[in-house]
Amino acid sequence: ALAVRRPDFNEVAVAQIQDKYSSYPSNGLTPQRLASIFKEADAGDIMRQAELFEEMEEKDPHLFSQLQTRKNAVTGLDYEVIPFDSDDERDKEIAEFVESELNSIESFEDVMLDLLDAIGKGIAVSEIMWGFEDGRTMVNDIRCRHQKRFFWDDEDDFRVRTRDAPEGILLPESKFIVHRYKARSGHPARAGVLRVVAWCYLFKNYDLKDWVSFCEVFGMPLRLGKYAQGASEADKKALMEALVQIGTDAAGIIPDGTEIEFKNSDKTSTTDLYERLARYC
């Protein structure tokens, strides 16, 4: 009889404290930084790209909604395990066993949701926690593993960083579920939906920041302070503080010999430019 090799019963990608931390690459994101993150991913190191994609989902509610719709379309489907040969008793027995194992997982829908993270990021990985009972190898649990724990080496082999091997090891056979989603052809590091929309996300980020700044001052006159020639640094500082105070409290005091002038902003300019750009992105 052919000997069947048992899977690894040990936990390989043990959760580590640094897994929950991020370098928050979206903070101060620029075209140069985004290009640098993508170059790292193209070379096999997807850590910063995975962190960026995670932030993009958190910060853009429309983007999150679109990805969630795709995921829910899958998790909402019914499923069944069909035997390879419906006339073969052994095949039917195997199918029934597999289905019972899936049903025994506390929340198989969460397992699917974790693996569907590949839609945005191009790849998602979960580790199978194997057990042995009554002479059978069983699935005790399926645990999501963060994408930043994985990378491609110089030979383009997929590896996982572990506590004992931070330099990475090849994935043990029958130990990990790797979902590679292809929004487009090419390497998995470049195949996720978020890779395609990242540039628009960056430009939208710039636009929203400028739009918020614009909204803060739109319709408000420019507050121009004038100080007398020979005014001291203390007088200049007091005048500036008064200008700021007027902006928030609509009242203020200034030293004698100084003046505040209000200049109305030009309202003839187009005010929907920011909204049009945000909608495009």
Segments and roles (model prediction):
Residues Y227-A231, I254-Y280:
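Extended, non-catalytic structural segments that build the interaction scaffolds
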Residues L2-F64, Q68-V74, V81-G257:
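Structured, contiguous alpha/beta core segments that scaffold functional sites
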Residues L239, Y280-C281:
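Generic structural signal for hydrophobic residues
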